[in-house]
Amino acid sequence: MLTFEDCLALCELTEDEIDAIAEHEQVSETVALELGSCLIHGPDGQLLIQHMIIDDIQAARRRGDLAHAAHLKQTLRRFIEEHCARAGKPD
């Protein structure tokens, strides 16, 4: 039986990115992991995930949770560096 950690190791996303998807979609981490894995391989998936994280940042700011907003901003920065910066580059 695969654990969450096993599935995370097979996914191209970090746990923070999965957590942001789960927060945005209001689903469990396991569902978010599956969704994120599908999105990251789709044509507009990187952009969709980016927008989810941005939405989460804005929601955290609106409710005054600046520490969480800062954490999500770091998550967004790492996501862009890892996925968007290498988009179109051969592996």
Q: What would you call each of these model-derived segments?
A:
Residues 1-52, 71-91:
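Long, non-catalytic architectural segments outside compact domain cores
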